[in-house]
Amino acid sequence: MTANPSLVLNKIDDISFETYDAPEISEPTDVLVQVKKTGICGSDIHFYAHGRIGNFVLTKPMVLGHESAGTVVQVGKGVTSLKVGDNVAIEPGIPSRFSDEYKSGHYNLCPHMAFAATPNSKEGEPNPPGTLCKYFKSPEDFLVKLPDHVSLELGALVEPLSVGVHASKLGSVAFGDYVAVFGAGPVGLLAAAVAKTFGAKGVIVVDIFDNKLKMAKDIGAATHTFNSKTGGSEELIKAFGGNVPNVVLECTGAEPCIKLGVDAIAPGGRFVQVGNAAGPVSFPITVFAMKELTLFGSFRYGFNDYKTAVGIFDTNYQNGRENAPIDFEQLITHRYKFKDAIEAYDLVRAGKGAVKCLIDGPE
C-alpha cells in the first residue's frame, strides 16, 4: 500500500502527523489527486480550539483540511474530463446522489453530506477524510480543472471564493448594485471581490480594523471602506459616497454588524447572512419587516459555484497578475511546508495577522 502522510486533529489542542494507507480507485469515476496546496479555514481553528461547530462535534480523530488543490495522479476507467497531470481544485463535500436536496439542486443542504474535515456524528463510522494529506480521492464531478494560468495556490482559494460566489448568487448581485460587505476576513474580502466581478457599481467593505480595510482596497475588492467604530448607518452611507446599499453580504455573524446592515440597507433590499454566530443573536425584525427586506441564509456553495469561482480566476488572470483587476494572491500572507503545519495552525489560531495561510502537501 502507498503511504499517505496526513495531519490529524485528535481532540481539542491535539494535532499530530500520522501515516495511513492511501485511498484507492474503487469506482469508474474516481480520481486520485496528489494534494499540493491547502488553506487553513476558520472552521479548522474552531475544531482545534473548541472541538465543535454547532451540531458538528469532534469525537474521534479527523484528518484536517478542506481548501485544497492538487494534481491528478490516477483516474478511474470511466473518467472523461480529467487526465493524469491535470491541476484541479477539490470540492470537498460529497452529497448523497439520492437525497431530495441533491435532486432539487440544493446539494449543499444534503443531510447525508460527507464534508472533508467535518465530524461524522454517526456511531461506528469514520470521519470524512480531510485534504491535508498526500493523496485524496474524489468523484470526477467534484473536481474542477484549473486553467494553465491559474496557479495551485489560487486553486486552494477556490473553496472560500465559492462561498462568496454562492452568497452573491443568492443576493442576485448584478450590474448597478451597491453592495455592503460586513467583515474583512478572507470570506468577506473574497465575497466583496465576487460582488465586484458580478458587476456591482459600488462595493463597501465594513470592519473595525483599518489594516483589514486597507487590504480590501489594496487587492481591488472594494470601491469604498468603512470602519464601523466611527459611526452608524448615516456615516456608512456617507462613506459610500451617499449611495445606499441595496444588497448586504453579512460575513461576520456579529450582532452589531447585522443591526448596522439592516439599518443601512435600502428598503426592498436583499440581505444575505453568510457569517455564523457563536450563539443566539438578537435580530432587528421590526426594521427588517418595515423595510420589506428579503433575507437569505447562505451555507457553503452549490451547483456550479466552484466552476464560477474558477472562471473568475481564469478571467482575472488571463493577462497575467500584473494586469489583473483584483490581486487575489495578496491574500496569501503566510506559506508553510507540510512538516511545519502545526506551527501554521497555531499562528492562525493566535490571530497573528494571517489573512490566508497555505500549507504545501507532503512531498
Curated annotation (Swiss-Prot):
Q: What is its EC number?
A: 1.1.1.9
Note the SMART domains from the entry: PKS_ER
Q: Name one GO biological process term.
A: L-arabinose catabolic process to xylulose 5-phosphate
- Pfam families linked: ADH_N, ADH_zinc_N
Its recorded reaction(s) are: xylitol + NAD(+) = D-xylulose + NADH + H(+)
Q: Which SUPFAM superfamilies match?
A: GroES-like, NAD(P)-binding Rossmann-fold domains
In which pathway does this enzyme or protein participate?
Answer: Carbohydrate degradation; L-arabinose degradation via L-arabinitol; D-xylulose 5-phosphate from L-arabinose (fungal route): step 4/5
Q: How is the cofactor bound?
A: Binds 1 zinc ion per subunit.
State the Gene Ontology terms under molecular function.
Answer: D-xylulose reductase activity; L-iditol 2-dehydrogenase (NAD+) activity; zinc ion binding
Listed binding positions for NAD(+) are 183-188
Cofactor entry = Zn(2+)
Q: For binding Zn(2+), which residues are annotated in this chain's numbering?
A: 41, 66, 159
Where does the source fall among the domains of life? Eukaryota
Q: Keywords in UniProt for this one?
A: Carbohydrate metabolism, Metal-binding, NAD, Oxidoreductase, Xylose metabolism, Zinc
The UniProt induction remark is: By xylose. Repressed by glucose.
Q: Which InterPro entries match?
A: ADH-like_C, ADH-like_N, ADH_Zn_CS, GroES-like_sf, NAD(P)-bd_dom_sf, PKS_ER, SDH-like
Tell me its family: Belongs to the zinc-containing alcohol dehydrogenase family.
What protein name is recorded for this chain?
A: D-xylulose reductase
The UniProt gene name for this protein comes to XYL2
